[in-house]
Design a protein with these regions (language model features):
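Perimembrane helix-loop-helix junctions
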Residues: 159-183
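Aromatic- and kink-enriched transmembrane "portal" helix at the membrane-lumen/periplasm boundary
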Residues: 95-113
Length: 320
């Protein structure tokens, strides 16, 4: 089965499209991120604007969301293929993304789709910046996109730590470049501050809502916990299994996976701050987990183990 995805086979695209539709049949009935109590007004307004995409509106909205998710998977696939972050990538990165998306709670929600495309874009710009002598414009855009995500929730300010560490890893950053990254990060908050001030609605809570810390475990069934655990366990197993092969690749590739691991750990920290709402924000892990999980499929001489994992993930997505 994985052989099909290792080559640019038209049949692989059909199978990927089928994987993208799996969330339509999910029996999940858990609160989504849009129902979290500590979202910022910016995020609430954005979700209201995209309310037509909410899967509760019917099959049309659900299928359109599936198309967007399928497009995101191909976007991530192109990033990894273009920059040769995998040997013979084929459609494996897209497969990794869609398999993990299928076991992610509320995968069709606009909140997950928005965050995913922004994180993929930031990752692409990070990789591109490696070979740029002067990447001032790229750094500002990275900072702006990171700041935009951070404006969704106060705890997402931790994204700035990842952006700073990632740039430090990817290139010999100077104080000027770090300042440009920081300026880009602050810009969304500046525009928000200016808009609220001009409309006489300026309040600190409107920009930085209080973080509702809740470290109690959510009440989920065993099957749902196993599915969510795959977002944590499978990427880690993949990095352990593929570590030797990745260690022999060029420096840009090794650094790209390193910043992905840092993002993965950063997202886990954010989820820990909202432990009771882990299932609401699990979508944060999708992009870094998919990038880390992709090398798993090329780490075995025989394909029966990767094929078994694919089958088990599809079953887990359908029977929850």
């Amino acid at each position: 089965m994985t052989y099909l995805f290792k080559h640019n086979n038209p049949l692989a695209l059909i199978l990927l499209a089928a994987l993208a539709v799996i969330p339509v049949f999910q029996p999940w009935s858990l609160p989504s991120l849009s129902q979290a109590q500590d979202n910022s007004p910016v995020f609430e307004k954005l979700l209201y604007f995209l309310s037509w995409l909410n899967p509760s509106n019917g099959i049309t909205s659900q299928l359109f969301a599936c198309v967007l998710i399928f497009t995101e998977s191909l976007f991530l696939n192109k990033v990894i293929s273009d920059h040769k972050l995998m040997e013979k990538a084929g459609y494996i990165p897209a497969l990794s993304f869609l398999l993990l998306n299928a076991i992610t709670p509320n995968a069709l929600m606009p909140s997950n789709i928005i965050i995913n495309v922004i994180l993929i874009s930031i990752f692409k710009l990070m990789v591109v910046s490696y070979k740029q002598n002067r990447s001032y414009n790229i750094l500002i855009v990275i900072g702006f996109l990171s700041g935009f995500v951070a404006s969704f929730n106060t705890s997402y300010l931790l994204i700035y730590i990842w952006a700073s560490l990632a740039i430090l890893i990817m290139r010999p950053i100077s104080l000027r470049e770090w300042a440009l990254l920081t300026v880009g990060f602050i810009m969304p908050f500046y525009f928000l501050f200016a808009g609220l001030y001009l409309t006489d609605q300026l309040k600190f809570q409107s920009i930085f809502p209080a973080i509702i810390l809740n470290f109690s475990m959510p009440q989920l069934s065993l099957l749902k916990w196993i599915s969510l655990g795959c977002l944590l366990i499978l990427p880690l197993l993949s990095m352990i299994k593929a570590g030797d092969k990745l260690g022999k690749m060029v420096l840009q590739v090794r650094k790209s996976y390193l910043i992905t691991i840092v993002l993965w750990l950063n997202c886990i920290l954010i989820l820990f701050l909202h432990l009771n709402g882990f299932h609401q924000r699990a979508g944060l892990l999708l992009v870094p987990s998919a990038i880390m999980f992709a090398p798993f499929f090329g780490s075995f001489k025989r394909e029966y183990i990767p094929n078994l994992i694919i089958i088990l993930l599809i079953i887990a997505a359908l029977i929850r």
